[in-house]
Amino acid sequence: MTKTIVVKIGTSSLTQAETGQLALSTIATLAETLCHLRSQGHRVILVSSGAVGVGCARLGLTERPRAIALKQAVAAVGQGRLIRIYDDLFTTLQQAIAQVLLTRSDLVQRSRYLNAYNTFQELLGLGVIPIVNENDTVAIDELKFGDNDTLSALVASLIEADWLFLLTDVDRLYSADPRSVPDARPIALVSSIKELAELQIGSQGSQWGTGGMVTKISAARIAIAAGVRTVITQGRFPQNIEKIIQGELIGTHFEPQPEPTSARKRWIAYGLLPAGKLYLDEGAIAAISLAGKSLLAAGIKLVEGEFDTQDAVQLCDSNGNEIARGLVNYNSNDLQKIRGCHSREISTILGYAGAETVIHRDNLVLI
């Protein structure tokens, strides 16, 4: 049966830790593995980091740049070299590829989000392997994915993939960082994202990359909400991807939600960037999380941030824990005036007849 497979490989797997030079044998094995998956009829997308790391090596830089302008310039140098290497390898294997560079704004605007979906579908229909990266050269800090783990999960969600593989520099998820805690417990299967709540996760990435295990768990949360089975496994052995698809329990598997969130609600939850926060009382939290109700003004205790009507906001409990996201029917100024008030009082307070709900349940998604 044809599957749609997204594979993300990080900088730490693509490069040699000591020198920052490309690990060509790993890249070649990855290319062969992806081509073999294609020959079996599967649809494949590769999300590849490495532009900045490769750019550093090409320019003789010994440390990853911190200044934004320099980092973007280095990414421009590295991306060209990286895609040329991929093209040479895949051409030898007679496999067409495409370069797809995305920014967060491509997924924030609904029309561009849908256009990205259509483009991926056309490429996959043509038998092409899209190679995706963040467009670091033009991305601004406020509209960055932050890491390619998040990008790969959003792509997997966008195209409703069957599998997401996060290839990293450890063989699986552990209860603590195995590089510093020798007795860290390996985790083979996560049947619910809630199981991770009390785990101590190493959040420091390698020198050449930006993503630690925390970002991979966040990515898994996005993917499993879309019904995508997610696996964290070692990047040095790309051939394990086929073994995993065939049923071997290698790495850490995150089971997908049995009832995936709708595409539109996934866009609200993960495609949009929240512009503010609403802190709710216990009654409102119970109403939206347990009863599937809309959010009313009466349940809002505090409004944080400046936002307009139909912006995305985070819904939080009194401790600041996020429980949901949604699109608001009022701007922040009006919400400051009506928070804690009954819906029938809104027209008197604001001087116009607004919506009965602050966030309608159709525009609200639990996190």
Swiss-Prot record:
Biological process terms in GO annotation: L-proline biosynthetic process
Record InterPro entries: AceGlu_kinase-like_sf, Asp/Glu/Uridylate_kinase, G5K_ProB, Glu/AcGlu_kinase, Glu_5kinase, Glu_5kinase/COase_Synthase, Glutamate_5-kinase_CS, PUA
Predominant localisation class: cytoplasm
Binding site for ATP: 8, 168-169, 210-216
Substrates-to-products reaction catalysed: L-glutamate + ATP = L-glutamyl 5-phosphate + ADP
Cellular location(s): Cytoplasm
Residues that bind substrate: 49, 136, 148
EC number: 2.7.2.11
Residues in PUA domain copies: 275-353
Kinase found in the keyword field: yes
Pathway of action: Amino-acid biosynthesis; L-proline biosynthesis; L-glutamate 5-semialdehyde from L-glutamate: step 1/2
Gene Ontology terms for molecular function: ATP binding; glutamate 5-kinase activity; RNA binding
GO cellular component: cytosol
Keywords: Amino-acid biosynthesis, ATP-binding, Cytoplasm, Kinase, Nucleotide-binding, Proline biosynthesis, Transferase
HAMAP family: ProB (MF_00456)
Family per similarity comment: Belongs to the glutamate 5-kinase family.
Function: Catalyzes the transfer of a phosphate group to glutamate to form L-glutamate 5-phosphate.
Protein name: Glutamate 5-kinase
Annotated gene: proB
